[in-house]
UniProtKB/Swiss-Prot annotation:
Keywords: ATP synthesis, ATP-binding, Cell inner membrane, Cell membrane, CF(1), Hydrogen ion transport, Ion transport, Membrane, Nucleotide-binding, Translocase, Transport. It comes from Ectopseudomonas mendocina (strain ymp) (Pseudomonas mendocina). Gene3D superfamilies: 2.40.30.20, ATP synthase alpha/beta chain, C-terminal domain, P-loop containing nucleotide triphosphate hydrolases. The lineage of its organism: Bacteria, Pseudomonadati, Pseudomonadota, Gammaproteobacteria, Pseudomonadales. This is ATP synthase subunit alpha. Belongs to the ATPase alpha/beta chains family.
């Protein structure tokens, strides 16, 4: 039997003690007390921040939303089925970030910026916080450059400018998404980057929008952020903020971007669900008290920023360029009720609204824009010169027509002036109709509006107004291509362009059929 020398034993113990790694690791850790409906209550997280990322076992993350005296209420980002009571939860010291940059263009991502289109990983060079403070008053510039939607009724009567927030509001299935998607398609050659955020939509609807953008050649210029109806309420609530951060990347570097939120009613519903599960007190229509702030802090981030802001943000790399983020939020109403809680909130936050009416849609007037109650509060300053000059009488003609049409139902004999106004109104209403996925250029719109404004439609039958317009535009494209190019390039209106349009339409009416 081998005998151990006591000095050897003490030497071995000494070596073991010296090689022991006893570096202390400070970690803020807590224990899950309850898990239900995507909400986790955690005990023991002392130094957690509001909105901080919390790490759970298995690579699942959550976000702290309720900081109470003895526990923290967090919402799980993704599936919570693997979590159970008694598991540990760690603070990360980070707030939620998403990837940003041109690498995301042409891709479909979820609310956390992960690709879901099967085209491989996105190697974005940068990431940014989902929740950011909007630029201050000093850094903003007034809106004076247009965003062409390609719709006659919108660009002529309710113009949208770069950096504006223009609400699209109406009942379900009356063309709200179609209008926004057409606005994105129209930007493919304008240099404006686009972000389309789908909140609580059916996956088939999102796939359809992506396919249409691809067919029109606009997907390469667009980021699609999708939080479909099958996603958790937390991701539907976060998706608009994530999309906004992706759009701000371009704004802050002196570029122009357009973001569509489709739709914010569903985001409010998702937020209501989270708030009620977190046991926050409900208010009107069971929405929490801060539902106004939910939308105001999102929409205030859409703005036009000054050259100084861009220069400061890029550390002098970009000089003399303003940046803009234009927002087109969509709100769905119930039976045309614009006085409900969320619609009134968003109307008061935005710089105007495009109101779509189901009665007009059902009677075949598409896009179903109600010119009477639609308004753009700042877009007038941004309108293209030629469109501004030619669209002056359009809104008046439509407003007078709707008033007189209601009156004419009861009157048997009408005087000549009233009859002329009615007939002109009918033709203008017909002219405002437009097919989906067929946005018009400034020149095409100008030809159309010039014909209406200068009385060239008076002898055209109401039923033939659309075919007249199509033939007229085709004629101008063929025989007056230089004039069309000049209008598209500058958007100016002068005596030369006036004479060119007049001569062209007169020649068309004398020589062509429609």
């Amino acid at each position: 039997m081998q005998q151990l020398n006591p000095s050897e034993i003490s030497e071995i113990i000494k070596q073991r003690i010296e090689s022991l790694d006893v570096t202390a690791q400070a970690r803020n850790e807590g224990t899950i007390v309850s898990v239900s409906d995507g909400i986790v209550r955690i005990y023991g997280l002392a130094d957690v921040m509001y909105g901080e990322m919390i790490e759970f076992p298995g690579g699942v993350y959550g976000m702290a939303l309720n900081l109470e005296q003895d526990s923290v209420g967090a919402v799980v980002l993704g599936s919570y089925l693997t979590l159970a009571e008694g598991m540990s939860a760690k603070c990360t010291g980070r707030i939620l970030e998403v990837p940003v940059g041109p690498e995301l263009l042409g891709r479909v991502v979820d609310a956390l910026g992960n690709p879901i289109d099967g085209k491989g990983p996105i190697n974005a060079a940068a990431s940014d916080a989902v929740e950011k403070v909007a630029p201050g008053v000093i850094w903003r510039k007034s809106v004076d450059q247009p965003v062409q939607t390609g719709y006659k009724s919108v660009d002529a009567m309710i113009p949208v400018g770069r950096g504006q927030r223009e609400l699209i509001i109406g009942d379900r299935q009356i063309g709200k998404t179609a209008l926004a998607v057409d606005a994105i398609i129209n930007q493919k050659d304008s240099g404006i980057r686009c972000v389309y955020v789908a909140i609580g939509q059916k996956q088939s609807t999102i796939a359809n929008v992506v396919r249409k953008l691809e067919e029109a050649g606009a997907l390469a210029n667009t980021i699609v952020v999708a939080a479909s109806a099958s996603e958790s309420a937390a991701l539907q609530f976060l998706a608009p903020y994530a999309g906004c951060t992706m759009g701000e990347y371009f704004r802050d570097r002196g570029e122009d971007a357009l973001i569509v939120y489709d739709d914010l009613s569903k985001q409010a519903v998702a937020y209501r669900q989270i708030s009620l599960l977190l046991r926050r007190p409900p208010g009107r229509e069971a929405y929490p008290g801060d539902v106004f702030y939910l939308h105001s802090r999102l929409l205030e981030r859409a703005s036009r920023v000054s050259e100084e802001y861009v220069e400061k943000f890029t550390n002098g790399a970009v000089k003399g360029k303003t940046g803009s983020l234009t927002a087109l939020p969509i709100i769905e109403t119930q039976a045309g009720d614009v006085s409900a809680f969320v619609p009134t909130n968003v109307i008061s936050i935005t710089d105007g609204q495009i109101f779509l009416e189901s009665a007009m849609f059902n009677s075949g007037i598409r896009p179903a824009v109600n010119a009477g109650i639609s308004v753009s509060r700042v877009g007038g300053a941004a309108q293209t010169k030629i469109i501004k000059k030619l669209s002056g009488g359009i809104r008046t003609a439509l407003a007078q027509y709707r008033e007189l049409a209601a009156f004419a139902q009861f009157a048997s004999d009408l005087d000549e002036a009233t009859r002329k106004q009615l007939e002109h109104g009918q033709r203008v209403t017909e002219l405002m109709k437009q097919k989906q996925y067929a946005p018009m250029s400034i020149a095409e719109m100008s030809v159309s509006l010039y014909a209406a404004e200068r009385g060239f439609l008076q002898d055209v039958e109401v039923a033939k107004v659309i075919s007249f317009e199509q033939a007229l535009i085709a004629f101008f494209k063929r025989d007056h291509a230089d004039l069309m190019a000049k209008i598209n390039e500058k958007g100016d209106f002068n005596d030369e362009i006036d004479a060119g349009l007049k001569a062209g339409i007169e020649k068309f009416k004398a020589t062509q059929t429609w």
